[in-house]
């Protein structure tokens, strides 16, 4: 029987329910801090409040408080929003914080126990620039050993063993750094052996997802167990996205709720809106790809939590799905994207 490995133990895939496949409940995103525009420096250095929130929404990576998604206030706000997610029909959350993002397994376990939401934790490596000295020079073999131990043996958290349930997010820049190539290859090798799910984070250029999949597939990884994240900010042309879809991995639109007039992490492109995300998913559904689609928010800054004026983890359930139904998407198709596909991806399938 197939199983899914949560932080509290294994369950059968049918128990997951509605699942967000790419979220964070605690991480350190200070690496991506950007100096504020001189005109708004004082507002963005101030504590987040109603009088400064508008500036933070425009320049989210220019507020140090906003990218410190790990302090006590952030954890309290994240827990509140996980409870709201549960209230509005959420069943599971896939926590994508990997090595380099300062994953907080203790907090993830506490959330799983206190909220009743299933949490699946990831192993793997984020970009090379965010690794400490103990990880920055790891070989493919060392990474493979680490990932397999995190999944099979588990890690000690307050005297108890907690096991990771997938590899991800495995992140890379472009051109892909040699360290990141090693991480992608290690993910492919371990996926082939264990049958686990894998989640990739591409850089913000169209070529990146294609190159990642080439490295992953050459290492032995299965396409049908791999998620390509952040495609709603990476491949904007639908025809090119359809070409990428031929590789057979999951197509993930995971920035729902991110609507901004200025995308700080790639100023050469305009971030699409939730309405455009819905329209693109409908186009992909019409192309017969509903069994390859996933949806999430990738919450990683405070201003996206409701305590800070944001939308929270329940945004897709309460605001997006009703709009999709209004535009002709069926309940069966929504269940496929939010329940069936996540369960198939997360189920261990050697």
UniProtKB/Swiss-Prot annotation:
Residue positions binding a divalent metal cation 1: 22, 24, 169, 298
Gene Ontology MF terms in the entry: hydrolase activity, acting on ester bonds; zinc ion binding
Highest taxon in the source lineage: Eukaryota
E.C. code: 3.1.-.-
Binding site residues for a divalent metal cation 2: 169, 201, 230
UniProt remark on cofactor binding: Binds 2 divalent metal cations per subunit.
GO biological process terms on file: catabolic process
Keywords: Hydrolase, Metal-binding
Cofactor(s) listed: a divalent metal cation
Hydrolase in keyword set: yes
Pfam families given in the database record: PTE
Family: Belongs to the metallo-dependent hydrolases superfamily. Phosphotriesterase family.
Protein name: Phosphotriesterase-related protein
Organism name: Drosophila melanogaster (Fruit fly)
């Amino acid at each position: 029987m197939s199983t899914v490995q949560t932080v509290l133990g294994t369950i059968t895939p049918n128990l997951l329910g509605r699942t967000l496949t790419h979220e964070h409940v605690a991480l350190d995103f200070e690496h991506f801090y950007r100096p504020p525009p001189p005109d708004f420096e004082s507002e963005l250095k101030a504590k987040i409040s109603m009088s400064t929130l508008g500036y933070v929404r425009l320049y989210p990576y220019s507020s140090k408080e906003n990218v410190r998604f790990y302090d006590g206030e952030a954890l309290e706000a994240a827990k509140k929003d996980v409870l709201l997610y549960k209230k509005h029909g959420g069943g599971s959350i896939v926590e994508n914080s990997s090595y380099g993002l300062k994953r907080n397994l203790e907090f993830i376990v506490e959330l799983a126990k206190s909220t009743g939401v299933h949490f699946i934790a990831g192993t793997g490596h984020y970009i090379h620039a965010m690794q400490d000295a103990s990880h920055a020079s790891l070989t493919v073999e060392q990474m493979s050993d680490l990932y397999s131990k995190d999944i099979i043996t588990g890690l000690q958290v307050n005297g108890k063993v907690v096991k990771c349930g997938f590899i991800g997010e495995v992140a890379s820049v472009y051109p892909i750094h040699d360290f990141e190539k090693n991480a992608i290859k290690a993910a492919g090798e371990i996926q082939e052996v264990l049958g686990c799910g894998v989640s990739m984070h591409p850089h913000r250029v169209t070529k990146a997802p294609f190159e990642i999949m080439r490295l992953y597939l050459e290492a032995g990884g299965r396409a049908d167990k791999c998620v390509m994240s952040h495609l709603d900010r990476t491949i904007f042309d639908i025809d090119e996205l359809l070409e990428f879809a031929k590789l057979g991995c999951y197509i993930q639109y995971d920035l729902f709720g991110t609507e901004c007039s200025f995308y700080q992490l790639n100023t050469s492109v305009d971030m699409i809106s939730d309405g455009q995300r819905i329209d693109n998913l409908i186009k992909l559904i019409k192309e017969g790809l509903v069994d390859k689609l996933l949806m999430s928010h990738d919450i990683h800054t405070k201003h996206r939590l409701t305590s800070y004026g944001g939308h929270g983890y329940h945004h897709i359930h309460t605001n997006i799905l009703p709009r999709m139904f209004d535009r002709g998407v069926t309940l069966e198709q929504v269940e496929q994207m939010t329940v069936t596909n996540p369960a198939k991806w997360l189920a261990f399938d050697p």
